[in-house]
Amino acid sequence: MFEYIKGIFVGFNKDYIVLDNNGMGYRIYTSGSTMAKMPKTNETVLLYIKQIVREDFIGLYGFLTKDEIEMFSLVISINGVGSKAGLSLLSICSVTNLKYAIVSGDEKTLI
């Protein structure tokens, strides 16, 4: 449904950031690697967005690069891997390293 959101970076919490877009604050869950690359407070940023809707939860997940959101989508499509596990994996492993681990069958990295 959403491709991206562009807005003012307001701040962050443990596992999400807040982005202001036209006076509306969006809670966007993201990886540690994206959080580490966020601009200074009150600066404009563009995040690629994936909306996840479950019976008990609706959430936005955002990333600075298309590669990272595509990897997140791929990882959470695996049976038994949820959005929290996907964010955790992307927080400790770069997209490049994850691609290599998948192609080479490196189970240690993937576990």
Language model regions located:
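Long, highly charged, low-complexity intrinsically disordered interaction regions
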Residues: K6, V10-I111
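Short coil-to-beta-strand transition motifs
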Residues: M1-I5
